[in-house]
Amino acid sequence: MLENIFHLKENHTDVKTEIMAGITTFMTMAYILAVNPNILSASGMDSEAVLIATALASFVGTALMALLANYPFALAPGMGLNAYFSYTVVLTMGYSWQLALMAVFVEGIIFIVLSLTNVREGIFNAIPMTLKSAVSVGIGLFVAFVGLQNAKLIVNSDSTLVTYQHFKGETFSSVGVGAILALIGVVITAVLLVKKVKGGILYGILITWVLGILCEIAGIYVPNPDAGMYSVIPTAFVSFDFSALGKTFGQVFKTDFSGVGILNFFAVMFSFLFVDLFDTLGTLIGVASKADMLDEDGKLPHIKGALMADSIATCAGAVLGTSTTTTFVESASGVTEGGRTGLTSMTTGILFLLATIFSPLFLTIPSFATAPALIIVGFYMMGSAVKIDFNDPSEGIPAFLTVLAMPTAYSISEGIAIGVISWTLINLVTGKAKEKKISPLMYVLTVLFILKYVFL
């Protein structure tokens, strides 16, 4: 039955590989179950309700990706978009979280329409192959940087923005030990991959977690919640109380629009739409490139199904009570493990569903255990750099700017924007536009990106 649904042989994979890949993707994404409630609760939402909504929205979106597109991509409420939801729309602009959910819901409806009319697919296909390769590399650096941050190997610095962790001081027994365990995890994962151990990334996560548990038992690792370092020893395994979901479920339809200008609402909604659109396209480009899923013209077969899954998941997430649900770049970890079909994403989706019951267990997976997986995935995604013609400055410079912008601006969509603007303008000014037959959509995107920087 699985063969008939997911076409495993056609995609040169098997059930074991797909399931291992799905588990790996989930393990690298599980942090969203802890982080999303923490961020959205700042807007006044109930954190327990958001946790359940996060798990259910992730299940719905990822299962739809498996069934509609047969791709190994997983979805969950997006980082960055959740921060914009709480800290900008609610806390800074002063809108209610119900109104913010309505903006997310409307954005999802618009995306469904755009997906049905091939607009999103057209944008994907209009982006030149050079930029698609650059997006893959940029996402690799972005993911690795996130991994370094999660491991506390890179921390904030007043003088240089960021700096490496200093392995001394009062927080050494928590932050310092966690960072060291993350480094050990990178080495362990690398050795497993060099030895071609199936599931090496997943085993790396589990081994690092076990080392953390042993260190905590021995008193070497000391939890410090003030520093974001929590106990890694599970104190409970299951929870069957889902009543909290009622505090957010359906609240989107109880939005009070009194005192809210229509232009202000659409400005908020457009911001969600813009970031979600290009984060999703960027992730699809990057992960699909890594998995060699793009055809010779740089197009992604069945992309309409993937975009539809993303759109419906956003609407479902808003109804359940969470910010924009989008395709996760951590899907690359499962692809690196050999995931090639929807069985990978279905496995991930089922684990998110189970997380509503086993949330106490999953929430104890420390960030220093999943960080090595993200760092290693970053390495694998660098392979697309060989597809970029750096000997041609009209191709190489926009590609370089795309790669540079993603980790430094901490945004996939900003990297795409910089890449599209620079690629179009450089080729237009140098007279290469006709030679390269630039798609009219690229001109439209360039204008839209410039307007975005001017007015938003």
Residue ranges and their predicted role:
Residues L2-N36, A57, G78-Y87, L91-I139, ...:
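Helix-loop-helix junctions within the multi-pass membrane cores of secondary transporters/permeases
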Residues S58-M79, I110:
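Juxtamembrane transmembrane-helix boundary signature
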